[in-house]
Amino acid sequence: MRFLAGGASASVAAVGAGTVADLWEVKRRGTAMGYFFLGPMLGPLVSPIIGGILTQRFGWRSTQWGAVVYGGLVWLSMIFLLPETSSKAVKGKEPAVAENSDDGNVQPVPESCVSRFFKALGRMLVEPFRLVGYLRSPPLFMTCYYASISFACYYILNLAIQRTFSRDPYSFRAIILGLLYIPSALGSIVASVVGGRWTDYVMRREAKAAGRFDESGNPKFRPSDRMCENAWIPAFVFPAALLVFGWTTHEGIFWFAPIVVTFFFGLGNSLIFNTATTMLTEILPGKASNAVALNNLMRNTLSCAAAVATDPLLGAIGTQWLFTGLAVICWASSGVIWALKRHSDKAPSA
Protein backbone atom coordinates (compact mmCIF):
# COMPACT_ATOMS: atom_id res chain seq x y z
CA MET A 1 0.00 0.00 0.00
CA ARG A 2 2.84 2.39 0.75
CA PHE A 3 4.32 1.56 -2.67
CA LEU A 4 1.05 2.47 -4.39
CA ALA A 5 0.67 5.62 -2.30
CA GLY A 6 4.19 6.73 -3.19
CA GLY A 7 3.63 6.16 -6.90
CA ALA A 8 0.35 8.06 -6.88
CA SER A 9 1.67 11.02 -4.92
CA ALA A 10 4.83 11.34 -7.04
CA SER A 11 2.72 12.04 -10.11
CA VAL A 12 1.11 15.01 -8.37
CA ALA A 13 4.46 16.77 -7.96
CA ALA A 14 5.50 16.16 -11.57
CA VAL A 15 2.21 17.07 -13.23
CA GLY A 16 1.58 19.94 -10.84
CA ALA A 17 4.97 21.53 -11.43
CA GLY A 18 4.48 21.14 -15.17
CA THR A 19 1.11 22.86 -14.92
CA VAL A 20 2.64 25.75 -12.97
CA ALA A 21 5.35 26.08 -15.62
CA ASP A 22 2.70 26.19 -18.36
CA LEU A 23 0.48 28.74 -16.65
CA TRP A 24 3.03 31.21 -15.29
CA GLU A 25 5.59 33.23 -17.20
CA VAL A 26 9.26 32.79 -16.35
CA LYS A 27 9.41 36.14 -14.57
CA ARG A 28 6.74 35.04 -12.05
CA ARG A 29 7.31 31.30 -12.05
CA GLY A 30 9.46 31.22 -8.91
CA THR A 31 6.69 32.79 -6.84
CA ALA A 32 4.08 30.36 -8.18
CA MET A 33 6.37 27.35 -7.71
CA GLY A 34 7.06 28.40 -4.12
CA TYR A 35 3.37 28.34 -3.27
CA PHE A 36 2.87 25.05 -5.12
CA PHE A 37 5.66 23.25 -3.24
CA LEU A 38 4.38 24.52 0.08
CA GLY A 39 2.22 21.39 0.17
CA PRO A 40 4.85 18.72 -0.63
CA MET A 41 7.36 20.31 1.74
CA LEU A 42 4.90 20.75 4.61
CA GLY A 43 3.41 17.26 4.36
CA PRO A 44 6.28 15.38 6.04
CA LEU A 45 6.45 18.10 8.71
CA VAL A 46 2.77 18.54 9.55
CA SER A 47 1.94 14.82 9.46
CA PRO A 48 4.11 13.98 12.53
CA ILE A 49 2.21 16.63 14.49
CA ILE A 50 -1.18 15.20 13.54
CA GLY A 51 0.10 11.63 13.86
CA GLY A 52 1.48 12.31 17.33
CA ILE A 53 -1.85 13.67 18.52
CA LEU A 54 -3.81 10.74 17.06
CA THR A 55 -1.38 8.14 18.41
CA GLN A 56 -1.37 9.65 21.89
CA ARG A 57 -5.17 9.81 22.04
CA PHE A 58 -6.45 6.86 19.99
CA GLY A 59 -3.47 4.57 19.27
CA TRP A 60 -1.36 4.01 16.16
CA ARG A 61 -4.19 2.47 14.10
CA SER A 62 -5.99 5.81 14.13
CA THR A 63 -3.25 7.27 11.92
CA GLN A 64 -4.11 4.75 9.20
CA TRP A 65 -7.83 5.48 9.42
CA GLY A 66 -7.03 9.18 9.35
CA ALA A 67 -5.06 8.67 6.14
CA VAL A 68 -8.03 6.80 4.61
CA VAL A 69 -10.42 9.63 5.46
CA TYR A 70 -8.02 12.27 4.18
CA GLY A 71 -7.40 10.35 0.95
CA GLY A 72 -11.14 9.99 0.39
CA LEU A 73 -11.70 13.72 0.86
CA VAL A 74 -8.92 14.53 -1.60
CA TRP A 75 -10.32 12.07 -4.14
CA LEU A 76 -13.82 13.54 -3.91
CA SER A 77 -12.41 17.06 -4.20
CA MET A 78 -10.57 16.09 -7.38
CA ILE A 79 -13.72 14.61 -8.92
CA PHE A 80 -16.04 17.53 -8.19
CA LEU A 81 -13.74 20.57 -7.94
CA LEU A 82 -10.81 19.98 -10.31
CA PRO A 83 -11.66 20.95 -13.91
CA GLU A 84 -10.26 19.10 -16.92
CA THR A 85 -7.46 21.11 -18.52
CA SER A 86 -6.32 18.72 -21.24
CA SER A 87 -6.99 20.30 -24.62
CA LYS A 88 -7.67 16.86 -26.15
CA ALA A 89 -10.32 16.06 -23.56
CA VAL A 90 -11.89 19.51 -23.71
CA LYS A 91 -12.04 19.80 -27.51
CA GLY A 92 -12.90 16.17 -28.19
CA LYS A 93 -11.06 13.09 -29.31
CA GLU A 94 -8.16 13.24 -31.72
CA PRO A 95 -9.16 12.75 -35.35
CA ALA A 96 -8.74 9.21 -36.58
CA VAL A 97 -6.05 8.33 -39.09
CA ALA A 98 -7.33 8.98 -42.61
CA GLU A 99 -7.01 6.98 -45.83
CA ASN A 100 -8.24 7.47 -49.40
CA SER A 101 -11.37 5.61 -50.48
CA ASP A 102 -12.09 4.27 -53.96
CA ASP A 103 -13.94 7.43 -54.97
CA GLY A 104 -11.06 9.66 -53.89
CA ASN A 105 -12.64 10.88 -50.66
CA VAL A 106 -10.71 10.73 -47.40
CA GLN A 107 -12.26 8.35 -44.92
CA PRO A 108 -11.27 8.05 -41.24
CA VAL A 109 -9.82 4.72 -40.16
CA PRO A 110 -10.89 3.82 -36.63
CA GLU A 111 -8.07 2.69 -34.36
CA SER A 112 -8.58 -0.77 -32.93
CA CYS A 113 -8.82 -1.42 -29.20
CA VAL A 114 -5.73 -3.64 -29.39
CA SER A 115 -3.71 -0.87 -31.03
CA ARG A 116 -4.80 1.66 -28.41
CA PHE A 117 -3.97 -0.82 -25.65
CA PHE A 118 -0.41 -1.41 -26.84
CA LYS A 119 0.16 2.31 -27.35
CA ALA A 120 -0.98 2.99 -23.80
CA LEU A 121 1.15 0.12 -22.51
CA GLY A 122 4.18 1.54 -24.31
CA ARG A 123 3.61 4.96 -22.78
CA MET A 124 3.42 3.43 -19.30
CA LEU A 125 6.32 0.98 -19.51
CA VAL A 126 8.77 2.39 -22.07
CA GLU A 127 8.46 6.16 -22.14
CA PRO A 128 9.39 6.69 -18.45
CA PHE A 129 12.76 4.98 -18.99
CA ARG A 130 13.52 7.14 -22.01
CA LEU A 131 13.39 10.18 -19.74
CA VAL A 132 16.49 8.95 -17.90
CA GLY A 133 18.47 9.90 -21.01
CA TYR A 134 18.03 13.55 -20.08
CA LEU A 135 20.33 12.98 -17.10
CA ARG A 136 23.24 12.94 -19.55
CA SER A 137 22.86 16.71 -19.55
CA PRO A 138 25.25 18.08 -16.88
CA PRO A 139 22.99 21.03 -15.89
CA LEU A 140 19.97 18.77 -15.44
CA PHE A 141 21.93 16.12 -13.55
CA MET A 142 23.61 18.66 -11.24
CA THR A 143 20.32 20.34 -10.39
CA CYS A 144 18.65 17.01 -9.62
CA TYR A 145 21.68 15.90 -7.60
CA TYR A 146 21.76 18.97 -5.37
CA ALA A 147 17.99 18.93 -4.83
CA SER A 148 18.24 15.23 -3.92
CA ILE A 149 21.02 15.80 -1.41
CA SER A 150 19.06 18.55 0.33
CA PHE A 151 15.88 16.45 0.38
CA ALA A 152 17.70 13.42 1.81
CA CYS A 153 18.96 15.62 4.67
CA TYR A 154 15.35 16.66 5.22
CA TYR A 155 14.34 13.03 5.79
CA ILE A 156 17.35 12.23 7.96
CA LEU A 157 16.64 15.19 10.24
CA ASN A 158 12.98 14.21 10.61
CA LEU A 159 13.94 10.67 11.63
CA ALA A 160 16.68 11.91 13.95
CA ILE A 161 14.26 14.22 15.77
CA GLN A 162 11.94 11.30 16.51
CA ARG A 163 14.74 8.98 17.63
CA THR A 164 16.72 11.51 19.65
CA PHE A 165 13.92 13.19 21.58
CA SER A 166 12.08 9.97 22.42
CA ARG A 167 15.11 8.83 24.47
CA ASP A 168 17.16 10.12 27.38
CA PRO A 169 17.87 12.85 28.30
CA TYR A 170 14.68 14.18 26.67
CA SER A 171 12.18 11.24 26.69
CA PHE A 172 9.27 13.19 25.19
CA ARG A 173 5.82 11.67 24.61
CA ALA A 174 4.46 11.09 21.09
CA ILE A 175 2.34 14.25 21.10
CA ILE A 176 5.31 16.40 22.14
CA LEU A 177 7.50 14.75 19.51
CA GLY A 178 4.99 15.81 16.88
CA LEU A 179 5.06 19.41 18.07
CA LEU A 180 8.86 19.51 17.70
CA TYR A 181 8.41 19.65 13.91
CA ILE A 182 6.65 23.03 14.04
CA PRO A 183 9.80 25.23 13.72
CA SER A 184 10.96 23.38 10.61
CA ALA A 185 7.47 23.67 9.13
CA LEU A 186 7.45 27.41 9.81
CA GLY A 187 10.80 27.73 8.05
CA SER A 188 9.38 25.96 5.00
CA ILE A 189 6.36 28.27 4.98
CA VAL A 190 8.55 31.38 5.07
CA ALA A 191 10.72 29.96 2.28
CA SER A 192 7.71 29.23 0.09
CA VAL A 193 6.20 32.68 0.55
CA VAL A 194 9.40 34.73 0.38
CA GLY A 195 11.79 32.50 -1.57
CA GLY A 196 9.89 32.48 -4.85
CA ARG A 197 9.61 36.26 -4.92
CA TRP A 198 13.30 36.55 -4.05
CA THR A 199 14.27 34.21 -6.87
CA ASP A 200 12.11 36.07 -9.40
CA TYR A 201 13.60 39.40 -8.30
CA VAL A 202 17.15 38.06 -8.70
CA MET A 203 16.36 36.73 -12.17
CA ARG A 204 14.95 40.07 -13.34
CA ARG A 205 17.91 41.94 -11.87
CA GLU A 206 20.48 39.68 -13.54
CA ALA A 207 18.79 39.89 -16.95
CA LYS A 208 18.64 43.68 -16.79
CA ALA A 209 22.24 43.93 -15.58
CA ALA A 210 23.37 41.80 -18.54
CA GLY A 211 21.44 44.02 -20.96
CA ARG A 212 19.31 41.19 -22.36
CA PHE A 213 16.04 42.58 -23.76
CA ASP A 214 13.67 41.51 -26.50
CA GLU A 215 12.21 43.72 -29.23
CA SER A 216 9.51 44.96 -26.83
CA GLY A 217 12.05 45.96 -24.20
CA ASN A 218 11.21 43.11 -21.81
CA PRO A 219 14.10 41.29 -20.08
CA LYS A 220 15.20 37.99 -21.65
CA PHE A 221 15.75 35.41 -18.93
CA ARG A 222 18.14 32.48 -18.66
CA PRO A 223 18.08 29.63 -16.12
CA SER A 224 21.50 30.68 -14.79
CA ASP A 225 20.02 34.01 -13.66
CA ARG A 226 18.49 32.20 -10.67
CA MET A 227 21.86 31.06 -9.29
CA CYS A 228 22.94 34.04 -7.17
CA GLU A 229 22.83 34.98 -3.47
CA ASN A 230 19.35 33.45 -3.25
CA ALA A 231 21.07 30.06 -3.69
CA TRP A 232 24.40 30.70 -1.94
CA ILE A 233 22.94 31.95 1.36
CA PRO A 234 20.61 28.98 1.98
CA ALA A 235 23.36 26.63 0.74
CA PHE A 236 25.40 27.79 3.74
CA VAL A 237 22.56 28.10 6.26
CA PHE A 238 20.91 24.68 6.14
CA PRO A 239 24.15 22.62 6.52
CA ALA A 240 25.15 24.92 9.41
CA ALA A 241 21.80 24.15 11.05
CA LEU A 242 22.47 20.42 10.66
CA LEU A 243 25.86 20.83 12.32
CA VAL A 244 24.42 22.73 15.29
CA PHE A 245 21.58 20.24 15.69
CA GLY A 246 23.96 17.28 15.73
CA TRP A 247 26.26 18.64 18.41
CA THR A 248 23.63 20.21 20.68
CA THR A 249 21.63 16.97 20.83
CA HIS A 250 24.80 14.96 21.42
CA GLU A 251 25.66 17.14 24.40
CA GLY A 252 22.10 16.90 25.73
CA ILE A 253 21.62 20.66 25.68
CA PHE A 254 18.17 22.01 26.56
CA TRP A 255 15.73 21.04 23.79
CA PHE A 256 15.02 24.64 22.76
CA ALA A 257 18.48 25.07 21.20
CA PRO A 258 18.46 22.14 18.73
CA ILE A 259 14.80 22.63 17.84
CA VAL A 260 15.15 26.35 17.08
CA VAL A 261 17.89 25.64 14.52
CA THR A 262 15.48 23.36 12.65
CA PHE A 263 13.64 26.55 11.64
CA PHE A 264 16.76 27.69 9.78
CA PHE A 265 17.16 24.22 8.30
CA GLY A 266 13.59 24.28 6.99
CA LEU A 267 14.10 27.79 5.64
CA GLY A 268 17.38 27.09 3.84
CA ASN A 269 16.46 23.62 2.63
CA SER A 270 13.14 24.75 1.15
CA LEU A 271 14.78 27.74 -0.55
CA ILE A 272 17.23 25.40 -2.26
CA PHE A 273 14.56 22.90 -3.25
CA ASN A 274 12.18 25.54 -4.63
CA THR A 275 14.94 27.26 -6.60
CA ALA A 276 16.20 23.97 -8.03
CA THR A 277 12.73 22.82 -9.06
CA THR A 278 11.92 26.15 -10.72
CA MET A 279 15.22 25.99 -12.56
CA LEU A 280 14.46 22.47 -13.81
CA THR A 281 11.34 23.74 -15.57
CA GLU A 282 13.54 26.23 -17.46
CA ILE A 283 16.47 23.93 -18.25
CA LEU A 284 14.01 21.65 -20.07
CA PRO A 285 11.53 24.13 -21.61
CA GLY A 286 8.23 22.68 -22.74
CA LYS A 287 8.89 19.45 -20.80
CA ALA A 288 8.72 20.68 -17.22
CA SER A 289 6.86 17.58 -15.99
CA ASN A 290 9.62 15.34 -17.39
CA ALA A 291 12.30 17.33 -15.57
CA VAL A 292 10.42 17.28 -12.27
CA ALA A 293 9.71 13.55 -12.67
CA LEU A 294 13.45 12.90 -13.03
CA ASN A 295 14.06 15.01 -9.96
CA ASN A 296 11.48 12.93 -8.08
CA LEU A 297 13.22 9.74 -9.20
CA MET A 298 16.61 10.86 -7.90
CA ARG A 299 15.50 12.53 -4.68
CA ASN A 300 13.11 9.76 -3.63
CA THR A 301 15.69 7.06 -4.35
CA LEU A 302 18.31 8.88 -2.30
CA SER A 303 15.80 9.71 0.45
CA CYS A 304 14.77 6.05 0.67
CA ALA A 305 18.39 4.98 1.10
CA ALA A 306 18.91 7.74 3.68
CA ALA A 307 15.83 6.69 5.65
CA VAL A 308 17.03 3.07 5.78
CA ALA A 309 20.54 4.06 6.88
CA THR A 310 19.66 6.77 9.41
CA ASP A 311 18.90 4.64 12.46
CA PRO A 312 21.97 2.36 12.10
CA LEU A 313 24.21 5.39 11.55
CA LEU A 314 22.82 7.20 14.58
CA GLY A 315 23.47 4.12 16.66
CA ALA A 316 26.99 3.65 15.30
CA ILE A 317 28.43 7.19 15.19
CA GLY A 318 25.88 9.36 16.99
CA THR A 319 24.14 12.56 15.97
CA GLN A 320 27.29 14.66 16.23
CA TRP A 321 29.29 12.85 13.54
CA LEU A 322 26.35 11.94 11.31
CA PHE A 323 25.27 15.56 11.01
CA THR A 324 28.85 16.79 10.75
CA GLY A 325 29.30 14.50 7.77
CA LEU A 326 26.03 15.68 6.22
CA ALA A 327 27.04 19.31 6.65
CA VAL A 328 30.38 18.70 4.94
CA ILE A 329 28.70 16.86 2.05
CA CYS A 330 26.16 19.66 1.59
CA TRP A 331 28.78 22.41 1.68
CA ALA A 332 30.93 20.52 -0.83
CA SER A 333 27.91 19.91 -3.06
CA SER A 334 27.11 23.62 -3.13
CA GLY A 335 29.82 23.91 -5.79
CA VAL A 336 26.98 22.87 -8.10
CA ILE A 337 25.65 26.43 -7.79
CA TRP A 338 28.86 27.84 -9.26
CA ALA A 339 28.74 25.33 -12.12
CA LEU A 340 25.08 26.00 -12.88
CA LYS A 341 25.68 29.74 -12.95
CA ARG A 342 28.09 29.20 -15.84
CA HIS A 343 26.81 26.15 -17.71
CA SER A 344 23.04 25.81 -17.31
CA ASP A 345 21.71 27.70 -20.33
CA LYS A 346 22.01 24.94 -22.95
CA ALA A 347 18.84 22.87 -23.30
CA PRO A 348 19.53 19.12 -23.00
CA SER A 349 18.35 16.44 -25.41
CA ALA A 350 17.22 12.93 -24.60
Swiss-Prot record:
Membrane topology annotation: Multi-pass membrane protein
**A GO cellular component annotation in the UniProt record:** plasma membrane
Q: Which UniProt keywords apply?
A: Cell membrane, Membrane, Transmembrane, Transmembrane helix, Virulence
Please state, per the UniProt record, what induces or represses the expression of this protein: Expression is positively regulated by the oosporein cluster specific regulator OpS3 that binds the promoter at a 5'-CGGA-3' motif.
InterPro entries attached to this UniProt entry: MFS, MFS_dom, MFS_trans_sf
Task: Write down the Gene3D superfamilies for this protein, in alphabetical order.
Answer: MFS general substrate transporter like domains
Where is this protein primarily located?
Answer: membrane
Membrane-crossing residue ranges in chain numbering: 3-23, 34-54, 65-85, 141-161, 174-194, 227-247, 253-273, 312-332
GO BP annotations of the record are: intracellular polyamine homeostasis
Deletion phenotype, per the entry, is: Significantly increases oosporein production.
Regarding protein family, the annotation reads: Belongs to the major facilitator superfamily.
Q: Which PANTHER family match?
A: MAJOR FACILITATOR SUPERFAMILY, QUINIDINE RESISTANCE PROTEIN 3
Protein name (record):
MFS transporter OpS2
